[in-house]
Amino acid sequence: MSASGEISTPRDYIGHHLNNLQLDLRTFELVNPHSPGPATFWTLNIDSLFFSVVLGLAFLFVFRKVAAGATSGVPGKLQTAVELIIGFVDNSVRDMYHGKSKVIAPLALTVFVWVLLMNMMDLLPIDLLPYIGEHVFGLPALRVVPTADVSITLSMALGVFILILFYSIKMKGVGGFVKELTMQPFNHPIFIPVNLILEGVSLLSKPVSLGLRLFGNMYAGELIFILIAGLLPWWSQWMLSLPWAIFHILIITLQAFIFMVLTIVYLSMASEEH
């Protein structure tokens, strides 16, 4: 465990691996994960932020390098893989997005690959990076799966929500957007309060469900790996962890795909002219 506590029971082990490396922005000091003080608005999960930024930069570097060295001849394995991903995302956008914006395909590609990379961190041995963080860098806690942190998934969903508002106002105008919120589904002024409540809930539910769906699935997957490592004897862990890891590959890919698809669909709905 960390220098500030020792693992004595499976409960301690599980709790340790569910603690984020947190920074108190008021004092710029690391938060002791074993202190009883609750997290506040000024508490930053710097491990989630660090890994999400690093993986995002890795995505940009690799795809930029492949694009710069692309050849019309026989492509290498990396170029082939990148072209397959780009083709898959491009076809998905063509099928689901009916607007005119040219940034949706690059956005969808970024969302899919970035979320997939963050999800794939769940396939690393559960103790590997936390052990390195503790014994090499002296970190009191470390979580390595950014999408198992609700603040990360809701932040990404918030970005999608801002784009929904942007394209809605861009395509319909401020008046059209307000009319959409106040005159649907009942097209009569007397029902404006009811329409506003119904449409407001429908609009706000999109980013909330988008972020919580990804968080819930990845948190559950991470927790299962922790339970396997914390409750079972070492000689039986591989018997469950290996099959679950193989099945989890499908889950992490599917969750990245769902996040991308819902982003495209929501932006397509926002781009419709009425």
Swiss-Prot record:
<comment type="function">
    <text>Key component of the proton channel; it plays a direct role in the translocation of protons across the membrane.</text>
</comment>
<protein>
    <recommendedName>
        <fullName>ATP synthase subunit a</fullName>
    </recommendedName>
</protein>
<dbReference type="GO" id="GO:0042777">
    <property type="term" value="P:proton motive force-driven plasma membrane ATP synthesis"/>
</dbReference>
<dbReference type="GO" id="GO:0045259">
    <property type="term" value="C:proton-transporting ATP synthase complex"/>
</dbReference>
<feature type="transmembrane region" description="Helical">
    <location>
        <begin position="103"/>
        <end position="123"/>
    </location>
</feature>
<dbReference type="InterPro" id="IPR000568">
    <property type="entry name" value="ATP_synth_F0_asu"/>
</dbReference>
<comment type="subunit">
    <text>F-type ATPases have 2 components, CF(1) - the catalytic core - and CF(0) - the membrane proton channel. CF(1) has five subunits: alpha(3), beta(3), gamma(1), delta(1), epsilon(1). CF(0) has three main subunits: a(1), b(2) and c(9-12). The alpha and beta chains form an alternating ring which encloses part of the gamma chain. CF(1) is attached to CF(0) by a central stalk formed by the gamma and epsilon chains, while a peripheral stalk is formed by the delta and b chains.</text>
</comment>
<keyword id="KW-0813">Transport</keyword>
<keyword id="KW-0997">Cell inner membrane</keyword>
<comment type="similarity">
    <text>Belongs to the ATPase A chain family.</text>
</comment>
<dbReference type="InterPro" id="IPR023011">
    <property type="entry name" value="ATP_synth_F0_asu_AS"/>
</dbReference>
<feature type="transmembrane region" description="Helical">
    <location>
        <begin position="223"/>
        <end position="243"/>
    </location>
</feature>
<feature type="transmembrane region" description="Helical">
    <location>
        <begin position="245"/>
        <end position="265"/>
    </location>
</feature>
<feature type="transmembrane region" description="Helical">
    <location>
        <begin position="43"/>
        <end position="63"/>
    </location>
</feature>
<dbReference type="Pfam" id="PF00119">
    <property type="entry name" value="ATP-synt_A"/>
</dbReference>
<keyword id="KW-0138">CF(0)</keyword>
<keyword id="KW-0406">Ion transport</keyword>
<dbReference type="GO" id="GO:0046933">
    <property type="term" value="F:proton-transporting ATP synthase activity, rotational mechanism"/>
</dbReference>
<keyword id="KW-0472">Membrane</keyword>
<keyword id="KW-1003">Cell membrane</keyword>
<keyword id="KW-0812">Transmembrane</keyword>
<dbReference type="InterPro" id="IPR035908">
    <property type="entry name" value="F0_ATP_A_sf"/>
</dbReference>
<feature type="transmembrane region" description="Helical">
    <location>
        <begin position="149"/>
        <end position="169"/>
    </location>
</feature>
<dbReference type="GO" id="GO:0005886">
    <property type="term" value="C:plasma membrane"/>
</dbReference>
<keyword id="KW-1133">Transmembrane helix</keyword>
<dbReference type="InterPro" id="IPR045082">
    <property type="entry name" value="ATP_syn_F0_a_bact/chloroplast"/>
</dbReference>
<keyword id="KW-0375">Hydrogen ion transport</keyword>
<keyword id="KW-0066">ATP synthesis</keyword>
